[in-house]
Amino acid sequence: MRTYEIMYVVRPNIEEDAKKAVVERFNGILASEGSEVLEEKDWGKRRLAYEIEDFKEGFYNIVRIKTDNNRATDEFQRLAKISDDIIRYIVIREDQDK
């Protein structure tokens, strides 16, 4: 099984309830596609290194998952691209210990 770390940034002008719904939705997508969620971190609101879509800040979230296929990460990326609430994301495959 492969381990992935996914970091995504939610737009800063979102209401708290809507932010929670976005986080639950995208974390649920990862869990529903046959992956195991190892860890979830909410880094809170942080300043961006550069402006993205006229935003200078964003809510950072990090999720670590373990999966044996790419369905979870592919579906996450597909939906994150079309979501107005996520302004940036990155999916990183962690090295396997040998």
Curated annotation (Swiss-Prot):
It comes from the Bacteria. The keyword Chloroplast does not apply. Coiled coil: none annotated. InterPro entries: Ribosomal_bS6 (IPR000529), Ribosomal_bS6_sf (IPR035980), Ribosomal_S6_plastid/chlpt (IPR020814), Transl_elong_EF1B/ribsomal_bS6 (IPR014717). Binds together with bS18 to 16S ribosomal RNA. HAMAP family: Ribosomal_bS6. This is Small ribosomal subunit protein bS6.
